[in-house]
């Protein structure tokens, strides 16, 4: 499992460094802004992605948006959006997606770690 996760992480880093990543990230953020509903929102991105802050702030939304670098270790990329008024969050960070896929694999295979 660890080898698969390391390979997946390497593929994610490769994707982040590609020309397709910026478009993917902006579309995920736009989708998440809709999903969390109306209200003030904070968008957390990796410190490497903070260079996209101005583009993110231009995404059409009627709410107040704040963009911040996530302080999480291994955030990798992607975004986490929090509606600060409604306390609703959508997590499209690669860290979360990898964790979810690992859990799905462990559940479907019947393996247990510990």
Outline where the language-model segments fall:
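Elongated, mostly alpha-helical coiled-coil "stalk/stator" tethers of large membrane protein machines
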Residues: 1-114
């Amino acid at each position: 499992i660890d080898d698969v996760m390391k390979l997946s992480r390497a593929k994610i880093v490769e994707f982040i460094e590609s020309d397709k990543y910026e478009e993917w990230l902006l579309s995920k953020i736009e989708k998440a802004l809709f999903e969390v509903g109306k209200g003030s929102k904070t968008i957390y991105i990796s410190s490497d992605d903070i260079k996209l802050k101005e583009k993110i702030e231009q995404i059409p939304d009627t709410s107040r948006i704040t963009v911040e670098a996530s302080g999480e270790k291994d955030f990798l990329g992607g975004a986490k959006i929090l509606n600060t008024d409604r306390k609703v969050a959508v997590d499209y960070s690669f860290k979360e997606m990898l964790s979810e896929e690992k859990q799905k694999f462990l559940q479907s295979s019947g393996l247990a770690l510990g």
